[in-house]
Amino acid sequence: MLAALAAKLRASMGILHKQDIQITARGLGEQWNDAILLGDDCAAIRDRDGYLLLAAEGMLPQLIETDPWFAGWCSVMVNVSDIYSMGGEPIAVVDTLWSQSPDSISELLAGMKAAAIAYQVPIVGGHTNCRSPYNALSVAILGRAQKLLTSFNAQPNDILLAAIDMRGQFHPDYPFWNAATTADPQRLRENLSILPYLAKSELCDTAKDVSMGGIIGTLLMLTETSNCGAILDLDRIPCPEHVPLERWLIAFPSYGFLLSIRPENVEAVQTLFQSQNLVCAVVGEVKVGTEVILRSQGESTLFWDFSQQALTGFSDQPVANLSKQIRDN
């Protein structure tokens, strides 16, 4: 039963899309700067007494065609989430927009504007082409952090916490758990402010936002960049009522973060999320090695072994010195 579930999850589109990143890793090769790690939710660039954070997202073409307002909203929201997942705060976004006509982008722009207002992040420029043979949208974001939450610092014996806003519902056509578009904007911002507080207070140094790969794909990316293994306890993952676990494991929540926490800080971190009516549950443990193991109802199965198969291809960078520098900062 568990082995069959693992096989389905490995074949899910979110996991397959993450493997596409290997093409970029190979194609860009050794041009990267050792001082800027690849594989985090944002590029963290040293700047004076902190870091500039830079990230970008391209929107699914089918989402743009079928639900353009939501696509516009998500283009801002997912970038904002990337900044906060690194312990930062957003400064501004820019967009790159292609459309077949001026009329065909009105809903995209309306969704982008609504999210920019809700998250208080200005859209300050970009590129627009209304004479394209297709509609497309990508958005980039700039942020700043004093101290980082990064994907490179998970350590054996860390406790894995999943922090999720369960006050939402699934999009009717996509694996998106929407707890944002009708929520109070101030609440959205307050919920996100927990992440930079965790970084500044040094209660946490390792986090990743739950993205298109769902909880399971996010864990793979986190363990790959940290050169660790993990055990994920499926029975402890908070799941909405009447939602099958298989569907939830690959869902993309509007507010979802996976954190790797030193055991002595777990209770304090959980209290911060729970005080804002967010679910924050222990879902596993980081282990020595290269294997990610799924566990449920007394049964265990190997889900991934990085010694046999890469996910993104960013695990073999020369990161030891900078990872220590980030931890010491």
Where do the protein language model's features map onto the residues?
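Active-site-proximal betaalpha loop/short-helix elements
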Residues: Q100, P185-S254
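Short, compositionally biased
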Residues: P172-R187
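Beta-strand->loop->alpha-helix junctions that form or flank phosphate-binding loops
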Residues: D34-L37, N129, V210, C228-P240, ...
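N-terminal glycine-rich phosphate/pyrophosphate-binding loops that anchor nucleotide-derived ligands
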Residues: M1-V76, V80-S85, V121, D158-L160, ...
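Small-aliphatic-rich amphipathic alpha-helix that forms the alpha element of a beta-alpha
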Residues: D67-V94, E107-A118, S193-A199, I215-M221, ...
